[in-house]
Structure formats: C-alpha cells, structure tokens
Amino acid sequence: MNYKFGVYGDSIAFGYGNNNQSWFDELYLRNEALKLAQNGEKIEDVFSKIKQDNNHYDTLFLAVGINNLLSGAPKPNQIDISNLINQYEEVLKVAKTKASNIVVQSVLPIREELFPNQDWLDEDKWGFNADVETFNQKLAELCEKHQIKYLDAYTGFCSLDLLKIYMDAVHLNKQGQNELAKIYNK
C-alpha cells in the first residue's frame, strides 16, 4: 500500500503520556499516513519491522535512538555509539527502498537529574546528554553520507525550558509535542 507519510520511532513519536498523540498525529494523520512508532522501540526493533514492511511512503520519518542510549552505568560514555550508528545505517539502507523521502530526527535532550528513578523503566538506567550529543553528531554525519534529511530537534529543544515541556526524563507532554511539531513544520 502507498502512504504519503509514515513514521517509525519510539515512545516520543508514539505519544506516550499524551493519549498516544504525538507530533506526527498533529501534522500528518489527516493525510494518508501510517504511524508505526511504539513505546520502548530501539534501533534494532525498527530495523526488524522496516525489513518486513511492504508499504511505500512518499515521506518516511525515523525518530528512534533514546532507548539505545540508556545505560545501567551511572556515568556517560559507556555506550558503543559506533555500533548504534552502524545499526542505524542498516535501517537507512532498507528505508531507502521503502520511501521516496526520508527524514531522520535527532534524539532530544534528556533531563539527566531525573535518572534513574523512572517508572517506565524496568530497571535502573541512566541517560546523559553527552551521549545524546555524540550520537546526534554521528547520526547527522551518517545522514549526510547517505544524502538523507537530518532534522536537528535537539538544538531547538536545548533553548526551551524542559521542565515545562517534559513529563519525565525523556517523554514530552502536550506542549512538548507541540514544540516538536513546530520544528517539523519549519
């Protein structure tokens, strides 16, 4: 089947905590669109799903990575970012066969001070903006290499008051989803 828009991603694209309504619903679901984002998704989950997807999209959004960047170690730089980028590259290779246009969204900043006490985590994990920044830099380079549009939402969110737009350490409230929709609309 052909869709104008599709999204693969994690809980932020799914709309966790917002009655499952995200920036994608706000901007695209009135069109021929398919939302394939799910809570807890990692890069490898998106790869498994996108390989099996028989649909074609005019524009496919990829918004995943934060769940891969959470670690059991309470300090930054414990994640093998190069391995994650290699996994993401495999996703992009398959995505190119499924969509005319691809947009890759950066991982958003996190509220480090709230880790590890997050109800949505099964175990204690930590997240660090230093890891997010490194990942985003490498992801932007990967997108440039593959001539895929990279949407830097991280920088825009760093200028906002995260206390007002986040409901926990990583998830956006309705106002946060609206801010992300504004970035997509630019």
Where are the model-predicted features located?
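A short helix->loop->beta-strand "cap" motif at the edges of active sites that frequently abuts
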Residues: 97-102, 148
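Short, well-ordered beta-to-alpha junction loops that form the rim of enzyme active sites
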Residues: 106-109, 153-155
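Histidine-centered active-site loop/cap adjacent to the catalytic His
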Residues: 30, 35, 46, 140, ...
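Conserved SGNH/GDSL esterase-like catalytic core that processes O-acyl groups on lipids
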Residues: 2-7, 12-90, 94
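Short glycine-enriched, charge-decorated loop/helix-capping segments at active-site entrances
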Residues: 74-81, 121-126, 165-169
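Alpha/beta-hydrolase-fold catalytic nucleophile elbow
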Residues: 63, 105-106
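Substrate-gating cap/lid alpha-helix
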Residues: 112-153
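A short acidic, helix-capping loop that chelates divalent metal ions and anchors anionic groups
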Residues: 44, 69-74, 113-115, 161-166
